[in-house]
UniProtKB/Swiss-Prot annotation:
One of its GO terms (biological process) is cytidine deamination. This is Cytidine deaminase. This enzyme scavenges exogenous and endogenous cytidine and 2'-deoxycytidine for UMP synthesis. One of its GO terms (cellular component) is cytosol. The active site is at residue 104. It is an enzyme of class 3 (hydrolase). The keyword Zinc applies. Signal peptide: none annotated. CDD domains: cytidine_deaminase (cd01283). One of its GO terms (molecular function) is identical protein binding. HAMAP family: Cyt_deam. Its EC number is 3.5.4.5. Substrate binds at residues 89-91. It comes from Serratia proteamaculans (strain 568).
């Protein structure tokens, strides 16, 4: 079991510990549970899916990186597949607060990067802030997305974000988590560059068309990729570096041990991720950063 889970796991009910043990003990536990694993756990513990999601929140919050706030938030995203994806807030010392990742953003992006086509619900241990409500409004599940909080009746994103402004107001029909392939091509031989380009091809940037992707190489050679997730309200957009850091963190790797990074983005786009990517990675101790353009 990854050390970060030990305290929270020890505080779970004994029946849930027993049901989870074999999954969470796996050295490659991906901070998610597949639908068949969820079914096995709920049947063994006598929980319904919602009760299980609430019970898992302390484990999700254990993935939090909060050196600035010391405020640990966990979120569980339920995919239409029935899979459950952990998410947590992530802060980076030495980087501006604008680079912070909220727990809901983390869970949503985690699901997206794992190939989940749409979400059914988000369970979180604190009320979603306005930033996260707007971020989730970009999803293909729209305002019907279920939001569940401890001690409250289930509600929809539409209840939390009435009279919302979103992609449809800008005549955007391709939404976040829709499967896309933008078809950008380069003659590449470097595997990390290929991974960054592949991520850019699956990014969501309908407002700027500045599609971008990042690939990070960990010290052991594992590669984590992230895609740009643009938002109709612009500011809640999630940069591709943050998406890659999400996958790195939930996978149990150390975001301060990035060996090498590659950004892929257009040569002449109206905006660039380059400066922010380099600056944030520098704050994390990585200087080996390169850029490829298409």
């Amino acid at each position: 079991m990854h050390p970060r889970f030990q305290t929270a796991f020890g505080e779970l009910p004994a029946t849930l510990q027993s049901a989870l043990q074999s999954y969470i003990d796996a050295p490659d536990f991906p901070a998610m549970l597949k639908a068949e694993q969820v079914d096995a756990i709920t049947q063994r513990c006598g929980l319904d899916d919602d009760a299980l999601a609430f019970a898992l929140l302390p484990l999700a919050a254990a993935c939090s990186l909060a050196p600035i706030s010391q405020f640990y938030v966990g979120a569980i995203a339920r995919g239409q597949s029935g899979n459950l994806y952990f998410g947590a807030n992530m802060e980076f010392s030495g980087a501006p607060m604008q680079q912070t990742i909220h727990a809901e953003q983390c869970a949503v992006t985690h699901a997206w990067l794992r190939g989940e086509p749409a979400l059914a619900s988000i369970t979180v241990n604190y009320t979603p802030c306005g930033h996260c409500r707007q971020f989730m409004n970009e999803l293909n599940s729209g305002v019907s997305l279920k939001i569940r909080l401890p001690g409250r009746e289930p509600a929809t994103l539409g209840d939390y974000l009435p009279d919302s402004f979103g992609p449809k107001d800008l005549d955007i029909t391709t939404l976040l988590m829709d499967q896309v392939d933008h078809g950008f091509q380069l003659a590449l031989t470097d595997e990390l560059e290929k991974a960054a380009l592949a991520a850019a091809n699956q990014s969501h940037a309908p407002y700027s068309n500045a599609h971008s992707g990042v690939a990070l190489e960990a010290e052991d050679g594992t590669v984590y990729t992230g895609r740009y997730a643009e938002n109709a309200a612009f500011n809640p957009s999630l940069p591709p570096l943050q998406a890659a850091l999400i996958l790195m963190n939930v996978s149990g790797d150390d975001c301060q041990k990035v060996k090498r990074a590659v950004l892929a983005e257009p040569e002449s786009a109206i905006l660039t991720q380059w400066d922010a990517t380099r600056a944030t990675l520098a704050a994390l101790g990585c200087q080996n950063v390169s850029r490829i353009t298409f």
